Design a protein with these regions (language model features):
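Walker B catalytic motif
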Residues: 150-154, 159-161
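Conserved structural motif at the start of ABC-family nucleotide-binding domains
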Residues: 13-15, 20
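Helix-to-loop junction immediately C-terminal to a conserved catalytic motif
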Residues: 44
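The feature captures the beta-strand-to-loop junction immediately N-terminal to the Walker
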Residues: 29-31
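Q-loop/switch helix immediately C-terminal to the Walker
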Residues: 78-82, 88-106
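ABC ATPase NBD coupling module
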Residues: 50, 62-77, 237
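Conserved beta-strand-loop-alpha-helix hinge in the C-terminal portion
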Residues: 210, 215, 219, 223-247
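Conserved ABC transporter NBD signature motif
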Residues: 52-61, 111
């Protein structure tokens, strides 16, 4: 709510207000450098992102000053666009720390479904391709099972062959295993217990071929300038670029509701 965030003394987010309902998935569009990743990392609580004004609420609780660990325990999870390599730490050991209730059988079966079993006993992300890193990130988020799933460009570095696998993993992470695409016009009516909330950064919109997204937002220069139907927003961006989005704040076109 009215979130202002600075990084190294530079204000990146300038009054962002965004509400994601329980079980909703929202997409976040915007050009490079607009503040999208800053928003996700601030929600997760990384220390270099300083909230100078406004607040973050989760499940009715003010978590603005909560630590990363506290937010994770409450049910906030994130998958990075460019996850770091961690020397000396295996993926299996990290999962055991972040998801202590998971059995080894659960870890291995989930990894096998993501074609990531061979990475469990390797150093985290060491020597992995972009697509392989994405699979290990999705493995971690599925096993953590957070109530709010934040995905930073899940399509980045993923080839077409693996995109369907990432899409399926995203559905699992968000509790939508039974949903098979965006053609379900009654998705809102079919909500069931177990649906997670999601905030997904996407440039290409490919992930929307695999998930029903309830709403989209365009972030530019640290401010949300458009909100509306995610598919229509994406179509507008593809046709006209982001310059048209500046007009959305006061326009009456259907895409800018």
């Amino acid at each position: 709510e009215d979130l202002h965030v600075s990084v190294m003394g530079h204000e990146v987010l300038k009054g962002v207000s965004l509400e994601i309902g329980e079980g909703e998935i929202h997409a976040l569009f915007g050009p490079n450098g607009s503040g999208k990743t800053t928003l996700l990392n601030t929600v997760m609580g990384f220390s270099r992102y300083k909230v100078t004004k406004g607040a973050i609420y989760f499940k009715g609780q003010d978590i603005t000053r909560a630590t990363i660990d506290e937010r994770a325990r409450l049910g906030v999870g994130i998958s990075f666009q460019r996850p770091p390599t961690v020397a000396g730490v295996t993926l299996r050991s990290l999962i055991s720390l972040s998801s202590p209730s998971r059995t080894n059988e659960e870890i291995e079966s989930t990894a096998e479904a993501l074609d990531a079993k061979d990475f469990l006993d390797r150093e985290i992300n060491a020597g992995l391709s972009g697509g392989e890193m994405k699979r290990t990130e999705m493995l971690q988020i599925i096993l953590q099972s957070p109530a709010l799933v934040c995905l930073d460009e899940p399509e980045s570095g993923v080839d077409l062959q693996n995109m369907s696998l990432i899409g399926k993993a995203a559905r699992t992470a968000l509790g939508r295993d039974s949903f098979d695409g965006t053609n379900c016009r009654h998705a809102m009516k079919l909500r069931r217990a177990g649906y997670k909330s999601g905030l997904i950064i996407t440039h290409t919109g490919q992930i929307m071929d695999h998930l029903f997204v309830d709403k989209g937002h365009v972030l530019m220069n640290g401010e949300i300038v458009c909100s509306g139907n995610a598919s229509e927003l994406l179509s507008e961006i593809r046709d006209h670029g982001y310059t048209e989005c500046f007009r959305c704040a006061g326009c009456e076109r259907g895409v800018c509701k």
